[in-house]
From Swiss-Prot:
This is Arginine deiminase. GO terms for molecular function: arginine deiminase activity. The keyword Hydrolase applies. The active site is at C392. Its EC number is 3.5.3.6. It comes from Mycolicibacterium gilvum (strain PYR-GCK) (Mycobacterium gilvum (strain PYR-GCK)). Gene3D superfamilies: Arginine deiminase, L-arginine/glycine Amidinotransferase, Chain A. One of its GO terms (biological process) is arginine deiminase pathway. The gene is arcA. One of its GO terms (cellular component) is cytoplasm.
Length: 402
């Protein structure tokens, strides 16, 4: 297969290339003692999660999508570039936490590794027991930690590639993740986009050192129109900073800042609303009537911020369409809440009117099908333990333009 062209200007243009992360050893680091800290609601059966993810990737390939695996991209970047290796090691080894003697010894060891084992440690972490050198008599940190404690924290949320980067037009945005357990993820995506041969000419639309914003909060409603959820993860400052960056680079003319609840069940905008067609969204019924948006528009020398309006009205106006269709799932409040928690509204569009969804959300999927949307179901008994659906697990890198 030839390399698919890169760039996205919508949520629903035919998908050509996507970045996924096959779950691996980092999920095996989860225990009842750390899963909350690492943002997982349970302990996934890793082998089954891998089977489910393989089926997801195979489905995309069967539809002509080029699947790029994050672990492969990371290994290839580390293999090609000494600067990439130094960048990854520097981000992983925290001298403030480990102390100078241990940090220096660990960094020296990591520099000796080939690309594949180094990539594994950068993703799956390392415990004190796994250190390949003896106890350093100068390191109080080494002496006072339990052997099972992490000297490098694992990154189980790499599974959700949507959040650490997203594409808009021909550019990529490296996000600024707000939760401590995820901050280092952006160092890996930044490394990949900076050093992998596939992305060397790609320019940036946002940088990780900017105000907090996460890809799950960003919806490309139409060419030039971007919705940004503001809640638990993305801040108002992040939404405003993204808007100004997109305006400066002529990547958008309108950004809709959408307030959402600051709670885990609605951590990102895409947990309650995703696009399923050029003029249609599926939305959590319990917030449909209350969801609002602050339109931010470019003007000479700055921006204008309008008063909040109903989201569906503000979106339709910005998109230049008469009405934004909201798929009426017709669910009672209890069923709606259950299926929202299981990522029923978190769909991945492969083309206009064609989406991937978790099979367990039978009621939502049935309503989508009744509305003319082709639903491609995938299993999710284990993938869902981190609270993310098909959209969360995918970073589209190439779509046909609308």
């Amino acid at each position: 297969m030839t390399d698919a062209p890169l760039g996205c200007n919508s949520e629903v243009g035919t998908l050509r290339a996507v970045i996924l992360h096959r779950p691996g050893a980092e999920l095996q680091r989860l225990t009842p003692r750390n899963n909350d800290t690492l943002l997982f609601d349970g302990l996934p059966w890793v082998a089954r999660a891998q089977q489910e993810h393989d089926a997801f990737a195979d489905l995309l390939r069967s539809r002509g999508v080029e699947v790029l695996l994050l672990g492969d991209l990371l290994t290839e970047a580390l293999d090609k570039s000494g600067a990439a290796r130094m960048q990854g090691i520097s981000a992983a080894v925290d001298a403030r936490r480990l102390g100078a003697p241990l940090a220096q010894e660990l960094s020296a060891y990591l520099r000796t590794l080939e690309a594949a084992p180094l990539a594994r440690i950068l993703m799956a972490g390392m415990t004190f027991d796994e250190l390949p050198f003896g106890e350093n008599e100068l390191s109080l940190v080494r002496r006072m930690h339990h052997g099972g404690d992490f000297v490098i924290d694992p990154l189980p949320n790499l599974l959700f590639t949507r959040d650490s980067s997203f594409w808009i037009g021909p550019r990529v945005a490296i996000t600024s993740l707000s939760m401590h357990a995820r901050v280092r993820e952006t160092s890996l995506t930044d490394l990949i986009y900076a050093h992998h041969p596939r992305f060397l000419r790609v320019r940036r639309a946002y940088e990780s050192r900017s105000a907090p914003i996460e890809g799950g909060d960003v919806l490309l409603l139409a060419p030039g129109v971007v919705a940004v959820g503001v809640g638990e993860r993305t801040t108002p400052a992040g939404a405003e900073a993204l808007a100004r960056s997109l305006f400066d680079d002529d990547l958008a003319h309108t950004v809709l800042a959408v307030p959402i609840a600051q709670e885990r069940a609605q951590m990102h905008l895409d947990t309650v609303c995703t696009m399923v067609d050029t003029d249609a969204v599926v939305m959590y019924p319990n917030i449909q009537d209350s969801l609002t948006a602050f339109p931010i528009r470019r003007k000479s020398g700055g921006v204008t911020i309008d008063r909040a309006a109903p989201f569906v009205d503000a979106a339709a106006d910005a998109m230049g369409i008469g009405k934004l269709r909201v798929i009426d799932t017709g669910l009672d409040p209890v069923t709606a809440e259950r299926e929202q928690w299981d990522d029923g509204n978190n769909t991945l569009a492969l083309a206009p009117g064609v989406v991937v969804a978790y099979e367990r959300n039978t009621e939502t999927n049935a309503r989508l099908a009744d509305s003319g949307i082709e639903v491609l179901p995938i299993a999710a008994s284990e993938l869902g333990t981190g609270r993310g659906g098909p959209r969360c697990m995918s970073c589209p890198a190439g779509r046909d333009p609308l």
